[in-house]
Amino acid sequence: MNAKKLLIGLVLAVMPIVTMADGKLSNKPLPETISTFLSTHFSDVKVAFHKEKNRLSDERYNIHLMNGTDIEMDRNGNWTEIDGHKNALPTSVVPEKIQKFISENYPNQTVFSLDKKERDRIEVKLSNGWELLFDKNYQLINIDD
């Protein structure tokens, strides 16, 4: 019985820390740049909820859409990660040169996720499970199958 109480106490003590690290739910309107991005690329999908994360001078927004897509954006409305969770992302969110490369080389595949990495690299996950890594000039530099 004491072990059970200790476990419950530990879980309750740690939950606020985990919640703060992940950001807090927000009922404030999203910044205009983010709202414009969403209406441009995801006009047919509603926002389920969004969270704000503040780390030092780095403000981020995690937007969760009703279709399961998760989008992380900076305060300027630039996406840093878009994860469709096995749902195809709209081609309009994929950088044009990357979309052209995928259309020409993987015509039967769709993009499931985009992730901006360090040194201006973009990782693209395709519907076949392959991960393509592009440099800042949108040149393919690695394939992980």
Describe each model-derived feature in a short phrase:
Residues 22-145:
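Interaction-mediating elements
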Residues 19:
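Glycine-rich phosphate- or other oxyanion-binding loops that anchor nucleotides, phosphorylated ligands
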Residues 1-10:
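Bacterial N-terminal signal peptides that target proteins for export
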